[in-house]
């Protein structure tokens, strides 16, 4: 069985523990983080779990951080062939055209956005200029989706992006609306042909999984990916939980590897 964990966060060692604990506190997680987001730790847990690849990223909380983070992610991916690098942008960042070209030239094809921590809405007008450029360059967007406490990243914020840029492939993480898994809110987004999702911080987060299975059925079955949300959750434990889900074997195989391998057409995985 081959596995891609396409939702992992990494941080430089000097800030990893602080960043992870702050995230855990913000989301009021039901249990302490399993890990702290260092590269060495992720490499070890991937080997232990038998996971073949991990997409790695970190969101810039200011325009100043964009280039530093993108170069950090690239440097780690160049050292670890099982890492798939994913970049970041920020609404205040002005040099986005040049930075997107730099990313593409260095084999980075995705952009991670986390509106809650970046302090702008997913559909901020400034971001539309960046999404347009990403679409032109055959790049993809992966966004944290949902927070019942603040309305900056729910399905209604990704819907206009996916509709305006039909060739921009958009990954709506956490089944499309973390913490507010209302199928009627998610369905209009999930049915769009350029929208994908992952199961990170969803099935593991709630006890009543019935609504989540209903949401899962809204998506094209080939548009669903496995992600652990490391370091908040342990990839090995999340993989085991995924194997125990009430999902047909062939569909589960797609979620664990084939779907993202097909999605990530830039190189053979």
Where would I find each of the regions flagged by the language model?
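Mid-to-C-terminal alpha-helical segments outside catalytic/metal-binding sites
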Residues: 1-9, 13-53, 220-223, 232-269
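A generic "structured core" feature
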Residues: 3-11, 103, 130, 171
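Conserved, mostly hydrophobic/aromatic
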Residues: 7, 46, 73, 103, ...
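A general structural detector for well-ordered alpha-helical segments in enzyme core domains, enriched
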Residues: 41-45, 69-76, 99-103, 126-130, ...
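Active-site gating/metal-coordination segments in enzymes
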Residues: 52-53, 61-142, 147-149, 191, ...
